[in-house]
């Protein structure tokens, strides 16, 4: 898996993966124009959409309605070091479901790659490289 993130100016970035593009920005109080989600919001979105995928797969497998299903994700900011903590995920599925199906949806959501990555922190390496530029072109 790979994404590229390019600085557009100010505190704005363009994120690309395959043929998809997402804008990342900051609200005005952080020097941005609020034209895209912030990095922490993108993390919450990643977790929520991943959990939603697994919940939808469970519903589909059991021939249950998945229209209108929503996932809400919240987290709190923590300091020292700066990070997010106390993630809370709520899966809202329209209609009435048995306790077994609610448990099944929860178990399916626990298969989410992002959820499991956050629960089992990966090793992260960081490298800084100098690149030569000719105008806007990298050479």
Labelled PLM ranges:
Residues 1-45, 55-139:
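Extended beta-strand/beta-hairpin segments
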Residues 50-51:
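Alpha-helical metal-binding/catalytic segments enriched in His/Glu/Asp
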């Amino acid at each position: 898996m790979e994404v590229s993130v390019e600085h557009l100016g100010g505190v704005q970035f363009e994120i690309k993966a395959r043929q998809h593009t997402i804008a990342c920005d900051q609200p005005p109080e952080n020097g941005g124009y609020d034209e895209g989600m912030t990095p922490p919001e993108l993390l919450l979105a990643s977790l929520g959409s991943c959990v939603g995928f697994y919940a939808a797969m469970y519903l589909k497998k059991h021939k249950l309605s998945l229209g209108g299903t929503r996932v809400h994700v919240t987290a709190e900011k923590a300091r020292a070091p700066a990070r997010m903590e106390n993630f809370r995920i709520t899966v809202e599925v329209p209609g009435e479901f048995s306790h077994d199906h609610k448990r099944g949806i929860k178990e399916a959501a626990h298969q989410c790659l992002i959820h499991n990555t956050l629960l089992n922190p990966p090793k992260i390496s960081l490298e800084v490289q100098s690149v030569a530029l000719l105008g806007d072109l990298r050479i």
